[in-house]
């Protein structure tokens, strides 16, 4: 029986979060979370790729032999990354100049490939699409949260340059939370990413343990 949709959503957003539980996608997590806007943009790009890739693999899984599945998965992810890369270059060019170097690296991100192998290759189309979407959104939430903490403490702002990603209305989100010269510079550098990500992983574990939840790794959600 295919997975329940509620379980898919809960796993993707919290219980099996790709960053906070599985520790996957650490390259963009360290490099692209200097600000909340960068984390949000990178996360949404990854979510789009994961949703589309899961959908395609679920549709064609019966036509792909076990021996060649990994190269096929990589080609599917690469094709979707190319679409996202070209779209961001066309419609979000200023943000693309910041994120563009790392968008192609989504192909080598272990999280999309892990979900293709663990879920999309075994489950029907709609659950697979939702798994990719919500695993991607969970990844987005983690990157945005890490970016927000690093940005606020490191440079005293929140959602700086959000208008580049979300449009002119998003200037309302751009806040100055403390004077710029009060910031702790190390937090907007890669070591700060390791520090904040590690603290968030610990915080999630403590919340889960306090709630009496079993700590487990992600897999297919079949019941």
UniProtKB/Swiss-Prot annotation:
Pfam families: Rnf-Nqr
Intracellular or extracellular location(s): Cell inner membrane
EC number in record: 7.-.-.-
InterPro entries tied to this protein: NqrDE/RnfAE, RnfE
Membrane topology summary: Multi-pass membrane protein
Main location: membrane
Transmembrane segments: 17-37, 40-60, 70-90, 94-114, 129-149, 182-202
CC annotations in GO: plasma membrane
Keywords: Cell inner membrane, Cell membrane, Electron transport, Membrane, Translocase, Transmembrane, Transmembrane helix, Transport
Function noted in UniProt: Part of a membrane-bound complex that couples electron transfer with translocation of ions across the membrane.
Assembly behavior: The complex is composed of six subunits: RnfA, RnfB, RnfC, RnfD, RnfE and RnfG.
Name this protein carries in UniProt: Ion-translocating oxidoreductase complex subunit E
Name of the coding gene: rnfE
């Amino acid at each position: 029986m295919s997975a329940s949709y509620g379980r898919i959503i809960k796993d993707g957003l919290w219980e099996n979060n790709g960053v906070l539980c599985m520790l996957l996608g650490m390259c963009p997590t360290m490099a692209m979370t200097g600000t909340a806007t960068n984390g949000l943009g990178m996360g949404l790009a990854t979510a789009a790729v994961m949703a589309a890739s899961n959908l395609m693999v679920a549709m064609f899984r019966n036509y792909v032999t076990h021996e060649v599945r990994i190269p096929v998965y990589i080609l599917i992810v690469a094709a979707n990354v190319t679409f996202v890369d070209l779209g961001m270059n066309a419609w979000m060019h200023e943000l693309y100049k910041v994120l563009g170097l790392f968008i192609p690296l989504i192909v080598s991100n272990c999280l999309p490939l892990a979900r293709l192998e663990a879920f999309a290759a075994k489950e029907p189309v709609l659950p697979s699409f939702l798994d990719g979407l919500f695993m991607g959104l969970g990844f987005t939430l983690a990157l945005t949260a890490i970016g927000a903490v690093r940005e606020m403490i490191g440079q005293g702002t929140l959602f700086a340059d959000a208008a580049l990603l979300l449009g002119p209305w998003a200037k309302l989100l751009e806040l100055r939370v403390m004077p710029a010269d009060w910031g702790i510079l190390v937090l907007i550098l890669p070591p700060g990413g390791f520090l904040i990500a590690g603290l968030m992983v610990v915080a999630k574990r403590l919340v889960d343990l306090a709630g009496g939840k079993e700590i487990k790794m992600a897999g297919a959600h079949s019941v």
